[in-house]
Amino acid sequence: GQNNHDWKRRSPVMMDTLQATGRFHIERAIVTKEEIANFKPDFGKYDVVLSNYNGEPWLEETQRSFVKYMKEGGNLVVVHAADNSFPNWQEYNEMIGLGGWKGRNEKDGPYVYWKEGKIVRDESKGRGGSHGRPLEYKVVVREKKHPITRGLPTEFLMVKEELYDRL
């Protein structure tokens, strides 16, 4: 129920795509600003949470419940701007690895990038999180055995997507 991108159009497309496989039972939660105080799902009922959310912070009770779910083996898929949703929630940002926007700067951690075959952690000062216009770019899979990338080709073309930078 909250995002700076067109969630009303994109969320149903994701749902339809997943349901068409016949492998998923899907429940959808739409939470408006007015309803956030009552958003207290039982995350333990789900094998995976797919988030297309970028809105008001969750209640601390809901955050604790979600952290517990993840520590007990829960799974999370963060879609596009959902990496921006909770800039001040440390555990969430640890779950997603790198987030951006909403005032992120060097105090939130180093910039992390790949240079000459190595991961670089750059402590330079400055704001973080941006992207240009959607474009095609090559994705190179460096960890082929990781559960997220297992089965993907070594290289593939990402078609018309925003390439995040300064993370």
Language-model features, listed with the residues they occupy:
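ATP/pyrophosphate-binding catalytic subdomain of soluble kinases
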Residues: 140-167
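A glycine-rich, often tryptophan-bearing local segment used as a flexible ligand/cofactor-contacting loop or short
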Residues: 56-150
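Helical hinge/lid and interdomain linker segments adjacent to catalytic or ligand-binding clefts
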Residues: 3-86
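A broad, low-specificity signal for short, low-complexity segments enriched in glycine/proline
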Residues: 10-12, 39-40, 134-138, 166-167
